[in-house]
């Protein structure tokens, strides 16, 4: 692949490539989200998270706390950025000033947190691929809740919360 973030401006047809820094190639880039300041945050399954300033082109990349696995990423209504680590089975809360990560442990071990999505109240919903569960982290109280999904072998891939706070999963 390109080992880069690419921006396409449909108004001007301009395509701009933002390459990963030397030494960070082959990050296996996955998902991106914008924070309130307009910075683009992204994950790499090879064990990185990163931030791109689209105006200056400056990119910073940090090692994820537990190595391989960063996958889905999303921005909560309060501007906090969260990501899921599929291989390392946790949710990370990113300090958008420093790139530091606070690890949030879902109740089920080795659940395979794959994607995250916030609701309007700032709760973070998590598709737990390996466990066949839906998780929800409430940062207001630091509490988790989980639901077992129906069927013999559920494997929720993505989670999405609509504007009415209804939670949707694809499996």
Regions found by a protein language model. Name each.
Residues 3-7, 47-51, 89-93, 132-136:
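A short loop-to-beta-strand structural motif that recurs across blades of beta-propeller domains
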Residues 23-37, 66-78, 108-121, 152-164, ...:
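Beta-rich, blade/repeat-based domains predominating
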Residues 9-13, 53-57, 95-99, 138-142:
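Short loop/turn segments that connect beta-strands within beta-propeller blades
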Residues 22-23, 48, 89, 108-109, ...:
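A short acidic/small-residue loop/turn micro-motif
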Residues 1-2, 40-46, 81-87, 124-130, ...:
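Conserved beta-strand positions in repeat-built beta-propeller and related beta-rich domains
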Residues 14-21, 58-63, 100-106, 143-149:
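A short beta-strand motif characteristic of beta-propeller blades
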Residues 1-4, 25-36, 42-48:
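A generic tandem-repeat structural signature
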């Amino acid at each position: 692949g390109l080992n880069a973030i690419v921006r396409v401006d449909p108004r001007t047809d301009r395509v701009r490539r933002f390459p990963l820094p030397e030494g960070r190639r082959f990050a296996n880039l996955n998902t991106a989200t914008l924070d309130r300041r307009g910075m683009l945050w992204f994950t790499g399954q090879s064990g990185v998270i990163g931030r791109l300033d689209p105006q200056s082109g400056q990119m910073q990349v940090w090692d994820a706390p537990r190595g391989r696995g960063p996958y889905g990423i999303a921005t909560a209504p309060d501007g906090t950025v969260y990501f899921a680590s599929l291989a390392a089975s946790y949710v990370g809360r990113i300090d958008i000033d420093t790139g530091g990560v606070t690890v949030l442990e879902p109740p089920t071990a080795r659940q395979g947190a794959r994607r995250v999505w916030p609701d309007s109240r700032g709760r973070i919903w998590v598709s737990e691929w390996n466990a066949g569960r839906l998780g929800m982290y409430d940062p207001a109280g630091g509490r988790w809740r989980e639901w077992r999904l129906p069927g013999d072998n559920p494997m929720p891939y993505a989670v999405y919360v609509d504007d009415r706070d209804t939670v949707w999963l694809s499996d």
